Regions:
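Short, intrinsically disordered/low-complexity patches at protein termini
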Residues: 41-44, 170, 184-185, 195
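Noncatalytic linker/hinge segments flanking ATPase motor cores
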Residues: 49-51, 141-144, 151-156, 188-195
């Protein structure tokens, strides 16, 4: 059964998933562990001094961070973020399974913690696929509909909602079919910025070209 992580990887690049399946990474990345730990301290961080906040790995200034946490405190997700009924839960659905960092009950929805940077607006496609997968798995476990998921970026003090719209469900289903049909290395991506940050770029052999070379 595919994991949430495998689906997110396939949404980013199916070939990257092939390499990860062949050579699985060891354990949870340290950056992910630090991000989750940071996300458990919001009640203290929202009132912390600049000096105290500078001791944490934040992606924004202390003033911006406090302002964003104060805005989060006014949202209905604050209780779930700071005192979730479930945390680090293994959720198994009909088609996929994986770990959910936090689970809220009112409303029922999963929260996925990301160590990375948020998109300028909305949620990155791989994270949307992962969020939909987690929401559907949670709905299967609880035998009740789940309408949304949250993606949390603790280093930025940002939380984005992913609704289970028809478009997001379709994106998830396409990715699930791609993962289930993966047999051997998929075709390489060509001339994409995604390859530049890939750990398997050298092994994959994908070549990216500059604008100068294209001209």
């Amino acid at each position: 059964m595919p994991t949430f992580s495998a689906l997110a990887t396939a949404a980013y690049c199916p070939r990257q998933l092939y390499y990860r399946r062949r050579d699985p990474p060891d354990g949870t990345p340290a950056a992910a562990e630090r991000a989750y730990d940071l996300s458990t301290h919001y009640p203290e961080l929202v009132v912390a001094s600049d000096t105290a906040l500078r001791t944490f790995d934040l992606a924004v200034s202390p003033a911006t961070y406090r302002r964003r946490l104060r805005a989060l405190r006014e949202r209905d997700c604050w209780q779930t973020l700071t005192d979730p009924p479930e945390s680090d839960a293994l959720v198994e659905g009909r088609d996929c399974r994986g770990r959910v960092q936090k689970v809220g009950y009112d409303p029922l929805r999963p929260v996925l913690v990301s160590p990375g940077d948020p998109a300028d607006s909305g949620v990155w496609e791989p994270q949307r696929v992962r969020a939909v997968a987690a929401a559907l798995a949670l709905a299967w476990r609880e035998r009740t509909p789940v309408e949304s998921a949250l993606v949390e970026y603790p280093r930025h003090g940002v939380v984005r909602e992913v609704r289970l719209t028809a478009g997001n469900r379709a994106l998830y289903r396409r990715t699930l079919r791609a993962v289930e049909g993966l047999d051997g290395p998929p075709p390489r991506l060509r001339d994409t910025a995604r390859c530049g940050s890939c750990d398997y770029r050298a092994e994959c052999g994908t070549k990216t070209r500059s604008l100068r070379s294209l001209l």
